[in-house]
């Protein structure tokens, strides 16, 4: 945890109000959530590796470095058009990725550190293709450093540790429930100026998924 606290400021920061508003909206939507002590992808990857969840939905390739057995990209943008092509959800297996490239997870972590992660800017002049070749040839970041003449990061072991054994914390996921339409409308339209049309689309998606209840319907928490 000390390493996490030290390296944490290098990642994106959110205000307490932003975090609380996200929790409030998730509660209104009936979405289960938990607060990770550091990186969301890291905590989710640990949960996936333990079998608590089936996959981690993220655009961040660091998810594989954290050891998630399965990663899903483009989940929320599936079917949309971007840059002239239709986006499709993509399921990525960590084991298949390692086997395809002939490396171990430890080597994948070293490769990620050389290329650049949330915790380290990377080594100048080393991209994914070059880094993979060097890692397969030399085996470790220390050996690559010796062969190519660059200095190792002072916090290398700490960064490795955050990927190989990411902190999960003691927080437990909240319970799931059905979404409350009136509460969502008040939160988004009245409280934050979202257009009625935009909120309607979101409400309709929840209804289509069978996730919506009206305020007149009791929930588990009403008893």
Task: Say what each PLM segment does.
Residues 45-49, 67-71, 133-135, 208-212:
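Short secondary-structure transition/capping segments
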């Amino acid at each position: 945890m000390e390493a996490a606290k030290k390296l944490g400021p290098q990642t994106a920061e959110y205000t307490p109000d932003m975090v609380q508003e996200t929790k409030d909206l998730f509660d209104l939507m009936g979405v289960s959530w938990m607060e990770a002590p550091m990186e969301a992808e890291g905590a989710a990857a640990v949960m996936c590796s333990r079998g608590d969840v089936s996959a981690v939905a993220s655009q961040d390739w660091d998810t594989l470095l954290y050891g998630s057995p399965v990663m899903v990209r483009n989940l929320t943008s599936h079917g949309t058009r971007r840059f002239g092509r239709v986006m499709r959800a993509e399921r990525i297996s960590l084991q298949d990725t390692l086997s395809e490239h002939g490396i171990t997870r430890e080597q994948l972590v070293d490769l990620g550190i050389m290329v650049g992660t949330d915790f380290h800017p990377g080594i100048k002049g080393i991209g994914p293709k070059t880094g993979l070749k060097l890692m397969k040839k030399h085996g470790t970041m220390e050996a690559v450093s010796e062969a190519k003449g660059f200095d190792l990061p002072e916090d290398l072991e700490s960064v490795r540790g955050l990927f190989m054994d990411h902190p999960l914390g003691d927080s437990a996921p909240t319970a799931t429930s059905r979404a409350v339409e009136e509460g969502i409308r008040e939160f988004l339209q009245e409280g934050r100026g979202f257009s009625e049309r935009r909120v309607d689309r979101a409400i309709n998606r929840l209804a289509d998924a069978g996730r919506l209840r009206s305020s007149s319907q009791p929930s588990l928490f009403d008893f």
